[in-house]
């Protein structure tokens, strides 16, 4: 019979923890998180079922989760206490010559499966799993795979936020148009940052091979401060110096742009500009722009001043909407959407 037990920690509200299927794909079980609560979906020869229950567990604390197939039901426990018992006629997976063989996927789904689920889910999950015991065989099989992949190792202590390791970016399609007027648009970005290195692109708009707007952190001449700059193409249109950006404290950065004016704020300091370069940005906004967080795609040399990937923690709101990296069109695998390394002070 199918059994799985492990310790689990996350701040993420939705995603796939584990998916197992029979070798011929006729039966499967999905263990997932939705609205922070455990959800089970399964299919066998008798039909399909979806059930969720228990309290929300996306609180960043460790929880012991177990799923066990019993004679006529599937039992789900959190911290050894039953939170769900799902009636299940027949066994989940049929034995073959006395053996139970299943394919198990952790923190994701095989490509073809998404549409076959009883209830659709965003599979991306940022969490940590330890103390594996699959099919009562301990962590054999799982441990070897994880040990070889540095990016799959858990951080010891985490807090809420998103972590960019300096190796990639996330891509979004965002509509900046102001509904009142076709010619009007608004870019209102607020972010909380805790950089780990002194140079990198935090937020950028890309139009074809140009970068009509970028918000970056760059090293300054002074040893204990960095600059936060706004560029249109390769021209700096606003900048502010900030002392000791790469420290445990979080810094609040704001960028407000209309076709008439641009305003950059860092903590309580502000730099305003109504440069003629805004007409370049306006032309791009009238066409099509793609939003990037944490870096840039390949653009021609000289298209912009900073091309390095951002390294550190960052949470971003665009036009008052918190961006969820799980909803990005694409995102580098090493970016952690919902957890940041905790700095011990």
Ranges and model annotations:
Residues 1-345:
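Non-catalytic extracellular/lumenal binding modules and the flexible linkers that connect them
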């Amino acid at each position: 019979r199918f059994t799985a037990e492990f310790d689990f920690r996350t701040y993420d509200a939705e995603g796939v923890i584990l998916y197992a299927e029979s070798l011929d794909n006729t039966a499967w079980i999905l263990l997932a998180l939705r609205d922070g609560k455990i959800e089970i979906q399964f299919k066998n020869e008798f039909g399909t079922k979806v059930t969720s229950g228990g309290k929300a567990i996306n609180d960043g604390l460790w929880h012991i989760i177990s799923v066990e197939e019993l004679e006529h039901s599937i039992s789900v426990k959190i911290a050894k206490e039953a939170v769900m018992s799902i009636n299940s006629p027949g066994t989940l997976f049929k034995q073959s010559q006395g053996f139970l063989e299943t394919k198990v996927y952790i923190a994701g789904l095989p490509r073809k499966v998404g549409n076959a689920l009883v209830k659709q889910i965003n599979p991306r999950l940022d969490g940590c799993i330890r103390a594996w015991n699959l099919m009562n065989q301990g962590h054999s099989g799982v441990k070897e795979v994880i040990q070889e992949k540095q990016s799959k190792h858990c951080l010891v202590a985490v807090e809420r936020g998103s972590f960019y390791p300096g190796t990639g970016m996330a891509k979004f399609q965002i509509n900046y148009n102001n509904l009142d007027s076709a010619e009007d648009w608004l870019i209102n970005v607020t972010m909380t940052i805790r950089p780990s290195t002194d140079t990198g692109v935090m937020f950028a708009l890309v139009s074809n091979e140009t970068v009509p707007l970028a918000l970056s952190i760059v090293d300054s001449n002074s040893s204990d401060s960095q600059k936060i700059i706004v560029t249109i193409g390769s021209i700096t249109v606003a900048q502010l110096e900030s002392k000791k950006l790469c420290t445990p404290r979080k810094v609040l950065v704001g960028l407000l742009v209309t076709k008439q004016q641009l305003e950059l704020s860092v903590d309580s300091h502000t730099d305003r500009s109504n440069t003629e370069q805004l007409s370049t940005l306006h032309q791009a906004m009238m066409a099509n722009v793609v939003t990037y967080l944490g870096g840039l795609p390949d653009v021609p040399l000289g298209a912009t001043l900073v091309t390095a990937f951002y390294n550190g923690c960052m949470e971003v709101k665009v036009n008052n909407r918190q961006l969820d990296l799980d909803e990005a069109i694409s995102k580098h695998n090493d970016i952690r959407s919902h957890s940041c390394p905790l700095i011990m002070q």
